[in-house]
Amino acid sequence: MANTFKLKTKANVGITTQNVYVVPSATTTVVIGITLANTSGSGCVVGVGITRPSTDDVKLLKNAPIPQGSSLEFMQGNKVVLETADTLTVNSDTNNSIDATLTIMEIT
């Protein structure tokens, strides 16, 4: 098994939920950290979720406020394991307001 560290990003996330990362086939992924930066001119509220193909979708973060010019790193040492075809999503209550940075380790 190979372990590969990767950085995934998604700029200008807004009201429409965006896929930041989809786990490739034959891969397990460990999410090491997620940072959400507010790039808008005002405060906004964000959410992070996991969409799974064969089970319930879940929220990791819901309606979390991020002040103007600030960022949020909400995992604080916790890890989340994702399986093949799981999708990590981000949304905001303000268009083009969030830059999302995801640090992961893929196990293949």
Q: What are the language-model segments listed below?
A:
Residues 30-32, 44, 62, 84-86, ...:
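A generic structural signal for short beta-strands and their flanking turns/coil linkers
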Residues 1-33, 91-108:
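C-terminal interaction-tip segments
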Residues 47-51, 101-103:
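Beta-strand signatures of extracellular beta-sandwich domains
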Residues 36-41, 53, 93-95:
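Short solvent-exposed strand-capping/beta-turn motif centered on an Asx-Ser/Thr pair
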Residues 53-87:
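Intrinsically disordered, low-complexity Pro/Gly/Ser/Thr-rich segments with frequent PxxP/GP/PP motifs
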Residues 51-55, 107-108:
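Short edge-strand/loop segments of extracellular domains
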Residues 10-12, 40, 61:
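Residue-level detector of intrinsically disordered/flexible regions characterized by low predicted structural confidence
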